Amino acid sequence: MEGDRVAGRPVLSSLPVLLLLPLLMLRAAALHPDELFPHGESWGDQLLQEGDDESSAVVKLANPLHFYEARFSNLYVGTNGIISTQDFPRETQYVDYDFPTDFPAIAPFLADIDTSHGRGRVLYREDTSPAVLGLAARYVRAGFPRSARFTPTHAFLATWEQVGAYEEVKRGALPSGELNTFQAVLASDGSDSYALFLYPANGLQFLGTRPKESYNVQLQLPARVGFCRGEADDLKSEGPYFSLTSTEQSVKNLYQLSNLGIPGVWAFHIGSTSPLDNVRPAAVGDLSAAHSSVPLGRSFSHATALESDYNEDNLDYYDVNEEEAEYLPGEPEEALNGHSSIDVSFQSKVDTKPLEESSTLDPHTKEGTSLGEVGGPDLKGQVEPWDERETRSPAPPEVDRDSLAPSWETPPPYPENGSIQPYPDGGPVPSEMDVPPAHPEEEIVLRSYPASGHTTPLSRGTYEVGLEDNIGSNTEVFTYNAANKETCEHNHRQCSRHAFCTDYATGFCCHCQSKFYGNGKHCLPEGAPHRVNGKVSGHLHVGHTPVHFTDVDLHAYIVGNDGRAYTAISHIPQPAAQALLPLTPIGGLFGWLFALEKPGSENGFSLAGAAFTHDMEVTFYPGEETVRITQTAEGLDPENYLSIKTNIQGQVPYVSANFTAHISPYKELYHYSDSTVTSTSSRDYSLTFGAINQTWSYRIHQNITYQVCRHAPRHPSFPTTQQLNVDRVFALYNDEERVLRFAVTNQIGPVKEDSDPTPGNPCYDGSHMCDTTARCHPGTGVDYTCECASGYQGDGRNCVDENECATGFHRCGPNSVCINLPGSYRCECRSGYEFADDRHTCILITPPANPCEDGSHTCAPAGQARCVHHGGSTFSCACLPGYAGDGHQCTDVDECSENRCHPAATCYNTPGSFSCRCQPGYYGDGFQCIPDSTSSLTPCEQQQRHAQAQYAYPGARFHIPQCDEQGNFLPLQCHGSTGFCWCVDPDGHEVPGTQTPPGSTPPHCGPSPEPTQRPPTICERWRENLLEHYGGTPRDDQYVPQCDDLGHFIPLQCHGKSDFCWCVDKDGREVQGTRSQPGTTPACIPTVAPPMVRPTPRPDVTPPSVGTFLLYTQGQQIGYLPLNGTRLQKDAAKTLLSLHGSIIVGIDYDCRERMVYWTDVAGRTISRAGLELGAEPETIVNSGLISPEGLAIDHIRRTMYWTDSVLDKIESALLDGSERKVLFYTDLVNPRAIAVDPIRGNLYWTDWNREAPKIETSSLDGENRRILINTDIGLPNGLTFDPFSKLLCWADAGTKKLECTLPDGTGRRVIQNNLKYPFSIVSYADHFYHTDWRRDGVVSVNKHSGQFTDEYLPEQRSHLYGITAVYPYCPTGRK
């Protein structure tokens, strides 16, 4: 083999095509980290400061660069994988949002990156060294052959080396070991600027980051890669942008694929002194070296796998109508001329020759002509025909193995005897995808496939793979190593259920079964009709008038056996619909997709299946308006309907109302190249209205890209060009229905002249008489037969759906349901079951393992520690009170060493607890001991002394009798632990029917009051009737209504002396969802205000002092409790506001206008008052309320939110009560507490439904509602959000716990687990403050230790409800 030599390495000039393919396959290995551009301090790099959101100082470029149409000299480099021409805003304004940004951006990997604590580094520099400029030039020339003379004069490099993603700090959690390395290079020659993005092998270990303010811990944003010009000058429209990634798979493709032939390397043309509408990616796969003066149109290469939002198509290069092109014969060898080699290595001695002098730097042809200039230096004015065959398989670039990786092995020698022949009959040259790629790690498995005529015997461990028979007589083989590769055994579920899976040398492929067609992953029955559903969005200028529409419906119906396609688009605005009448290609896509196939041809669905992107650009003449239409197919739904999304952007000519469009039958040529189909044509259309007949035209460029299975051999007879014949073209807009309709009839087959007289079989031209659900089988001449499609039955001319579910001809297994569909059926598993691997058998869903339940956790024994399950296999351990340690190892705390008992008592330490007992001669509870008296004691005092002695034992809940000064029983007795009260006679025995539950008004005991004229109430009459029925003395398990002194029903009712309790309204009716289980008392709120027995104070505000203080509600008043730091200033507490006849429950504060807001369940109102002297209350909501309880104020949006536990609603309104809105009215039983995070826009609330308590969240407009917490909670009364720690915390009167979690529900932990009966809670500094119904006061808890630090018990002994903290300033959300 002859070849030129440069720097001691051979440079291939002209090789037979099959010798070139193995070299390309050897280069398929990903970019090695050593092949990045040189970087580090030794190369002059500057180092960006460590941190989460750092930005470099401005970099003043010695030579300006062009970005889009602008020229700039300043650059900034950011931590988060981004470069900009201006300083960055705070990361919260862009890092968690999709492209485009509102500032100029060059983003090789935009994500939330954090280099704190030495987790990687970011380096950057401007460079003019020949080594860097030479490598940049070689990359650019390889990707942009028309820029073969590009010689950069300066470059800018930025490298992110071993950087990590931002992670929330969690106790005991180690940082992730996933680190990324990538590089961006900007190169310019003063006129044009190019960007290179490099991603080495194993360089992207994380593909995205989680938003800091995520609602859901599972949410992860894929990294954004691309370019953005920034907002336009008027700040009302976004500038052009180019996005390369949108999914996790597209990010993964960054290092697996390439747009210039080297996996992990990407090149883009980003700026020029000439007009550049948008960034243009490299597309080396689009090149055709033979007759390269007429480059092919847009042909997506690997870059399409990244799901680009803007697809570069080089439409400017189309200067010829494909329908008029003359196809000349050409030799396959011509395709090899002109491809370059790329040397990506850096030698120890840098070649300092000018770039023009090194023959390895320019991609020249054998004759010395640069690629893209064959036939003349200027392509714009020259149009020459090219070989039709080259549209099928453009020749790959010629690559020298040594120049790619000098340290790797060279390929084995190949015979030079010329035995390798071109394709027979002058067929197309195979591309690099026509033979299996050589991956050294992959295992080769050959199985029969209809397109291949032989198999090769296999040996264990390594397999030999011969070239296909049609390549020629060469018997050269390649040896592969048997290693991991994807096979049917583990991946057959990726195939359609109407397909079979076949293993090949490098992987597996799916193929549709007989009587079905498609690409194997999506298969449809032959001859059956098909349906399409989708959405259409558009941003158009009709003439000069902007028209916008979003997600309007698209429906299409296709008659598969004659190629008819009907499309309807609903509710497009009339000006746009009228202007879109000529654009039949919108519905024409379905014509190509399901066209009637002539022999040897395939329609679009047979190739692309149900996942592809159709991109077309239409230019109207003579006005040259341009519109871009992108249609994305997103698979088949359960009914086998194709789902498609359409986006229309650009300008279209105005079409007057009442004009109709007429388009004659036409033909289109479609060119097939690997995973891309292209077509270019011109089309005339007429607009008529009465006698007016106008003729216009447009030119259309189409690109259809899809994924092919590269493992199966390509069928050699598949045509590279097919002709689509379109007849009966119909377009109509119905103004009354607002529906735009298209109809076309399509046939696809070989390219034929119009004069071809050969008659067609009715099966091929659609003139047969078969049923629309039947397949047409051609016979001899014009004979044919009809056969009903799969899933239908009949004689072929009349077919009806076969109900497989009714006849039993289905494969749905036990525990599944068969659902009949037109021509098919679907299996669905019953609740609690899921599909097995065969997708027919339903198996029982195995619940995920819970280490805390199955005993696989590593926590200390149950009596010492608590295991907390966090989902999946994760858990945490926490020592119980009385023990210390990390939860895995817990040791008993010796409380006796802390001297907690009275000096006259003895301390007894027990595991996890302790007790105190008074010494002989003293009596008391051990914490307080009093010398014993020798005087005689009354029965009450004796029982009291005995109970106090028993109370010293741990866990004791004895009642301690209350005696008066003479030692007699007080008529009213109350249990100090449970809160129950009752009347006793002089001997201390309980008076039947007088017991009242905690939280209610105690009974009136003692002498009967003077007779009054008040008649007995419903409650009193019902109580008397039941007592009479029970014989005057009810048993402990019999219910007796509890009434207060005025005869009203006490809000809390209990069944006898049991703990089965529930809430009632003022009429005694049970409140739904409040019935409790033993051990938990529901938190019932009265709805009738108690009578005022003292003079009523003025309802105005007693102004508080300056500083932070607490406001709490207590029946008819709002109390004021100042803070000294975090300590309660109990001596300065006072009443802020008194409101006779009210029951004030919810309370919150507006820090901007210094106003307090509250809810009143007695008055059924929401009111407010200022905190200045003498301010009077103002009612702002007084209708549509029954029991308004929780209240939250958004001081930023000037909005309030409240809950109503009777109407079961959550509502919002502005702070003046206007613009009232119901956010939620379903799936609520007892909504109570509510909290708002104004800075991040989140709303949280509790629902203490006894059957299913929960904490929920949503956005402030009511969107994205979801359950945050619904396990291990009982009666979540109180809720608070701390804007400083970003923690959501709640107090639970059922579990007796105070707990906190992150806003997304993660990081849940218990602060205190021994609360009494909390109602409301607020967070301030390092403390929580909550109201408690057992203590009837305010209790403070330290956030960090969980210890009770103080309590305040108001003079008035009644329940406290809501509580809030009043700051002297408004909290902010800055980090």
UniProtKB/Swiss-Prot annotation:
Residues 108-273 form the NIDO domain. GO terms for cellular component: basement membrane; collagen-containing extracellular matrix; extracellular exosome; extracellular region; extracellular space; plasma membrane. Keywords: Basement membrane, Calcium, Cell adhesion, Disulfide bond, EGF-like domain, Extracellular matrix, Glycoprotein, Methylation, Proteoglycan, Repeat, Secreted, Signal. Glycans are attached at S358, S359, N417, S452, N658, N693, N703, N1124. LDL-receptor class B repeats lie at residues 1154-1197, 1198-1240, 1241-1285, 1286-1327, 1329-1373. PROSITE patterns: ASX_HYDROXYL, EGF_2, EGF_3, EGF_CA, LDLRB, NIDO, NIDOGEN_G2, THYROGLOBULIN_1_1. The modification Omega-N-methylarginine is found at R1308. Interacts with LAMA2. Interacts with COL13A1. Interacts with EFEMP2. This is Nidogen-2. It comes from Homo sapiens. The lineage of its organism: Eukaryota, Metazoa, Chordata, Craniata, Vertebrata. The gene is NID2.
